[in-house]
Amino acid sequence: MPPKKAPAAPQASKKTEQKKKEKIIEDKTFGLKNKKGAKQQKFIKNVTHQVKSGQQNPRLVAQAEGDKKNKKDDKMKELQELNDLFKPVVVAQKVSKGADPKSVVCAFFKQGQCTKGDKCKFSHDLSLERKCEKRSVYVDGRDDELEKDTMENWDEKKLEEVVNKKHGEAEKIKAKTQIVCKFFLEAIENNKYGWFWVCPGGGDTCMYRHALPPGFVLKKEKVKEDKDEDISLEDLIEKERAALGPNVTRITLESFLQWKKRKRADRILKLEEEMEKRKEDFKSGKSLGVSGREVFEFRPELINDDDEEADDASYTFELEDSEAEEIDDVQDIDLSRYVLKDVDETGITVASCERFSSYVASTEKDENKLCVASGGVMENENQSEEEQEGDLENGFVDAVPVDENLFTGEDMDELEEELYTLDLEK
């Protein structure tokens, strides 16, 4: 590995260096400051200069300072020459007696050389010069205003005024026609019409009208009207309800059914009238708009005529057993048969609260299934003790005798599991 660099010695501060230089100057000029000789004073000056300038030759130092000063002077002269060449000469302004200096534009401000700012007695508004200057016969001041006056800032009245001014005289000379030029309408609709618009169809010699048709509405005006008329459904309903007034018929089920029945009858009557009208039109030879189904409804004899005019060749088509389908009579559903009515509660059964007790009785019967399956007597709470004793005296026993030694212990366990899992039907 390369040897590590020795740490840089800390640099002495400027004050420390200055003290060292003063110490050196005092040592070299010790005892000479109080002497008045020219040689001693010159020697002290040279020593002081050498120490402060870093032991440099005083001639070289003086020469470097002279060169630096000369370069600075040369730059100043060069800038002065450039300013004299390219900067226009500004003559001091004179204002006539009694005139307002603020009505005159500052000449230095026009050249970008005014350094007075707000303290300048002349005006710094460049528009004053254009307002006060004489009107030129070669420039029309209205051109700038017309260029800024575009169709975006016009309303419907302004548009009519511009059209009348621009095309009014030309429209009087043209042949009378009511057709509006399509280029004119496209320019207005696309917001391209203005003072300097020229018709692509021939300018002023276009044979069509360059005037707004009656009832014309601009797009932006139309959008505003649509926005104003656009109201919500809730507001519309409330508005219509308020317009009905207080003296109106209240809606009930009976009135609603009567209204619906009347509407259905009116609709059926209207359909019949339309069908009769179509039939009369068909008879008179006006078959336009008549469907094929209506043709056969109006003239059913056409069905038989079509069968007679058919080819003599007959085609048979038999379905296989797998493809054969049973065809049942199908009837169309007529929605007019269904009428809304109040629900009649007569004859409607309601579940009683006793259904819970019957459910408990059925569960008790299920518990007796185990006794019956094991050959025991079914428990009967309604049977009295006297009847049970009478059965024993007569020798009738309902239970089947079982030999307990017939089964071993394991067989009994399996039998008990089967009996518990066994579920018999009633």
UniProtKB/Swiss-Prot annotation:
Primary residence: cytoplasm
Region of interest called Disordered, as start-end residue ranges on this chain: 1-27, 51-74
Coiled coil location: 62-87, 257-283
SMART domains: ZnF_C3H1
Subcellular location: Cytoplasm; Nucleus
Biased composition (Basic and acidic residues): 14-27, 65-74
PROSITE patterns, per database record: ZF_C3H1
GO biological process: cytoplasmic translation
Protein's UniProt keywords contain Secreted: no
Pfam families xrefs: DFRP_C, zf-CCCH
Positions of the UniProt region annotated as Required for interaction with DRG1: 237-261
Tissue-specificity statement: Strongly expressed in ovary. Moderately expressed in brain, kidney, spleen, testis, intestine and colon.
Keyword Coiled coil: yes
Zn finger (C3H1-type) location: 100-127, 175-213
A GO CC term attached to the entry: cytosol
Compositionally biased spans, kind Low complexity: 1-13
Keywords, ordered alphabetically: Coiled coil, Cytoplasm, Metal-binding, Nucleus, Repeat, Zinc, Zinc-finger
GO molecular function terms listed in the Swiss-Prot or TrEMBL record: mRNA binding; zinc ion binding
Function: Protects drg1 from proteolytic degradation.
Family, per entry: Belongs to the ZC3H15/TMA46 family.
Subunit structure: Interacts with drg1.
Protein name: Zinc finger CCCH domain-containing protein 15
Organism whose genome encodes this protein: Xenopus laevis
Lineage of producing organism: Eukaryota, Metazoa, Chordata, Craniata, Vertebrata
